Swiss-Prot record:
Catalysed reaction, written as an equation: UDP-alpha-D-glucose = UDP-alpha-D-galactose
Protein name stated in the entry: UDP-glucose 4-epimerase
Gene3D superfamilies listed in its UniProt record: NAD(P)-binding Rossmann-like Domain
Principal EC category: isomerase
E.C. no: 5.1.3.2
Record's signal peptide: none
Family, per entry: Belongs to the polysaccharide synthase family.
Alphabetized CDD domains for the sequence: UDP_invert_4-6DH_SDR_e (cd05237)
Cited InterPro entries: CapD_C, NAD(P)-bd_dom_sf, Polysac_CapD-like, Polysaccharide_Synthase-Rel
Native organism: Rickettsia massiliae (strain Mtu5)
Keywords on record: Isomerase, Lipopolysaccharide biosynthesis
């Protein structure tokens, strides 16, 4: 599917971009693909990536998704786009909501418009569980990003750019996530700061995140949203699992929820579950393709919305302490930190 094709990853110097490159370099994809373009703002991270991967098919472009001209020029000749550029720290976005809008909404508008303008074949937009029933600025901005993608998908004709969305739960050990924080606190002999012990979060690995995007890339139709079924854990169990793994006796201190945090997250709303396709490891939420001429739907009838439960970190499979430890030990990041402990 990537033979002689050019792929662009926006925000490509982040955890997801590095995971994609690592996957491709370990497979035949790197032999098939024509070029991988990393589009991001940080020249230092791009230089680090060039040195780390050392592959002539990797090309780095300095630019900002907030600037349409820079993303449009970088997208010339691109076949596929994985749009990962985002502001994702919930408390930060609470203090700077317009910055979240500028990157997550207006930046996404620029990426999608540039993709359509450059006749890109397919775009996969990376979203978050916080976009479902959003209560914080980050989630609201990502929800609007999803709406932008679906609205543009609805207006595409057959043969035009296909736009799909993937929703993530918490990606373990990704940049800015809680696992690196806990490990750092353990190594420094500090208290482990837990916001709310009963708070639950979905647990996805970086491998899972790449799997989800590649699944959506291979199977997605116009306007589809894809969600990977994931287990969950309470924050307290996650912290205790890391204590056991690192043989730590650090005290745990409860500090209360931060700005904009939810007690649990949702990956699929109850309304979406009514029309979702269960694909064993994934849910596919097809686009509502109706137009604004609602009169014909009243005449023809429309399948009513079923009263189904939403898919949340409270009602998915809950991992116990040993299961969380087993999952954490599969992460390369945790293994590296253990070696350096």
């Amino acid at each position: 599917m990537f033979v002689d094709k050019t792929l662009m990853i926006t925000g490509g110097t982040g955890s997801f971009g590095n995971a994609v490159l690592s996957r491709f370099l370990k497979s035949d994809i790197i032999n098939d693909i024509k070029e991988i373009r990393i589009f991001s703002r940080d020249e230092k991270k791009q230089e680090d990536m060039r040195i780390a991967f050392n592959n002539p098919k990797l090309k780095c472009y300095i630019g900002d998704v907030r600037n349409y001209k820079s993303i449009d020029e970088a997208m010339h000749g691109v076949d596929y786009v994985f749009h990962a550029a985002a502001l994702k720290q919930v408390p930060t976005c609470e203090f700077y909501p317009m910055e979240a809008i500028n990157t997550n909404v207006l930046g996404a508008e620029n990426v999608l418009s540039a993709a359509i303008n450059n006749k890109v074949t397919k775009v996969i937009v990376l979203s978050t569980d916080k976009a479902v029933y959003p209560i914080n600025a980050m989630g609201l901005s990502k929800a609007l990003m999803e709406k932008l993608a679906i609205a543009k998908a609805r207006m595409r004709s057959p043969g035009e750019t296909v736009l799909c969305v993937t929703r993530y739960g918490n990606v373990m050990a990704s940049r800015g996530s809680v696992i690196p924080l806990f490990i750092n606190q353990i190594k420094q002999g500090k208290e482990l700061t837990i916001t709310e012990p009963s708070m639950t979060r979905f647990l996805m690995s970086l491998v899972d995140s790449v799997d989800l995007v590649l699944y959506a890339f291979e199977h997605g139709h116009q306007g589809d949203i894809f969600v990977q079924k994931s287990p969950a854990s309470t924050i307290e169990v996650l912290a205790k699992a890391l204590q056991d793994i690192f043989d730590s006796k650090n005290e745990i201190r409860f500090i209360g929820t931060r700005h904009g945090e939810k007690h649990y997250e949702s990956l699929v709303s109850s309304e979406e579950m009514a029309k979702a396709d269960d694909l064993r490891d994934y849910y596919r939420i097809p686009m509502d393709g109706r137009d604004l001429n609602y009169a014909k739907y009243f005449v023809e009838g429309e399948k009513k919305v079923a009263l189904l439960e939403d898919y949340t970190s409270h009602n998915t499979k809950r991992l116990n302490l040993e299961e969380v430890k087993e999952l954490l030990l599969t992460l390369d990041y945790v293994q590296e930190e253990l070696k350096n402990a």
